[in-house]
Amino acid sequence: MRLIPSLAAIIIATPALADPKVIADLPPVHSLVAQVMEGVGTPTLLLDQGGSGHSLSLRPSQASAAQEADLIFWIGPAMSPALEKPFETLGENAHVIALMTAPGTLIIDTADSEPHTHDGEEGHDHEDHAEEGHDHDHDHEEHAEEGHDHDHDEHAEEGHDHDHDKHAEEGHDDDHAAHAEEAHDDQDHDHAEDGHDHHDHGPEDPHVWLSPENAKTWLALIAEELAEHDPDNAATYESNAKAAIANIDTLTAQIETTLAPFEGREYLATHRAFAYFEARFHLAPAQALTGIDGGAAGPRAMEEVREAAEDGITCLITEPETKEATVATLTEGTALEAHFLDPLGRDIAPGPQQYTQLLQNIAATYADCLK
């Protein structure tokens, strides 16, 4: 009889395992993580008060939360360079995953329009991926400093090989052998001369979340990482990831139907942020106007608008960062219709449905602009 209260005391004194503390950098990433964690917990969003993902930095309260986090999912330094140093100095409990360098991630070079994978693997079977996981080794004690050690021999989409050792600190080397998709092989866009860049993105376009294929790859990875830190809920993470992947497949088919009539139709953009979306849905690469970086439209941009008008182009895709006065100047006296799009979906409520709504909004805006 004496053992019973002793056992009860032991049970009472044993703390229950807390739900993993998870942080995501941008609203679309947060949405994907939230989908996988649904029914278990809620991730924390860093970009929670507007602003730009390119200039995202940690507030003191966020830095404290990051120190206590179990998992941090972010795009990587190509998108938010100010986060790299803080993430490198986090405590040993914080496991940082840069999604842009995750295996299987499709990458588009800023001087190109065709995606290639970020490794040399055979590709992902998204039906089985959440269950079977990635074919790569994790050293979780050193992941925040050294990243994943990936050894991938080949992949189905003929990308290029990456050495991912220490990618969180040192970046990665690319061997650009070939490109996966051929949706845009009829146009050559030299963005150093003909386009512009709101931000110095470097050699690779960081807007990787706008590829639904990348989202599916990441959902499986997110489930795997969560399961390793919280094995008691592994089945829930796996089931949620599979359901989210299936939903993206359904959404992708719907968007393909919506945008099929506009394949190859040309348009202008104040900033070429939607290359991944364009490539996946066979849209012509945007003709990015020169020198518009949130400021006034210069003579060259106006000349490009005039030439576009002569070619019968009537669609202009612009972003919230572009001033309304600039847009008015660009469209005045022309047949151009400006349509605003936010690649981050900051006008959409954060949560599990944000990513789906973001892609739906982009598709609807393109269809309306290109009609």
Predicted segments — roles?
Residues 9-10:
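Terminal low-complexity/disordered tails
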Residues 13-17:
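N-terminal signal peptide c-region/cleavage motif recognized by signal peptidases
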Residues 1-5:
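Positively charged n-region of N-terminal signal peptides that target proteins for export
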Residues 19-371:
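Extracytoplasmic metal-acquisition and chelation regions
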